[in-house]
């Protein structure tokens, strides 16, 4: 059984027991979160596609870790002008483990 959920403006295909890195959620480590925006639920040949969401479906997950990804560095310059700038960015993420899919 698997589901496609929407969180943080992205879609993720998840199954029970999967660990997924999603955009930062406002939840503490060890707590439980529920994803209500379920787009698709499949159990073998039984597939439920939402229009746009599946009614009554939800995915429960446990927050494993809060962290930041590796640094992404951007460098801009203008030739012959002695002008340059260097920026760094680390995107925060939340690692969740899917516990239960209800449809």
Curated annotation (Swiss-Prot):
InterPro entries in alphabetical order: bL21-like (IPR028909), bL21-like_sf (IPR036164), Ribosomal_bL21 (IPR001787), Ribosomal_bL21_CS (IPR018258)
Signal peptide annotation: none
Pfam family, any one: Ribosomal_L21p
MF annotations from Gene Ontology: rRNA binding; structural constituent of ribosome
Any one Gene Ontology BP term: translation
GO cellular component terms, A-Z: cytoplasm; ribonucleoprotein complex; ribosome
Key words, A-Z: Ribonucleoprotein, Ribosomal protein, RNA-binding, rRNA-binding
Family matches, as SUPFAM superfamilies: L21p-like
PROSITE patterns referenced in this protein's UniProt entry, alphabetically: RIBOSOMAL_L21
Its biological purpose: This protein binds to 23S rRNA in the presence of protein L20.
Family to which the UniProt record says this protein belongs: Belongs to the bacterial ribosomal protein bL21 family.
Complex and partners: Part of the 50S ribosomal subunit. Contacts protein L20.
Name of the protein this chain belongs to: Large ribosomal subunit protein bL21
Lineage, highest ranks first: Bacteria, Bacillati, Bacillota, Bacilli, Lactobacillales
């Amino acid at each position: 059984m698997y589901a496609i959920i929407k969180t943080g403006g992205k879609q993720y295909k998840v199954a029970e027991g999967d660990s997924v890195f999603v955009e930062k959620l406002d939840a503490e480590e060890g707590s439980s979160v529920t994803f209500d925006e379920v787009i698709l639920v499949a159990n073998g040949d039984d597939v439920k596609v939402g229009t746009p969401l599946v009614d009554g479906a939800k995915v429960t997950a446990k927050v494993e870790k809060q962290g930041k990804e590796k640094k992404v560095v951007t460098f801009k310059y203008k030739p012959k002008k002695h002008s340059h700038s260097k920026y760094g960015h680390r995107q925060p993420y939340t690692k969740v483990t899917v516990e239960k899919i209800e449809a």
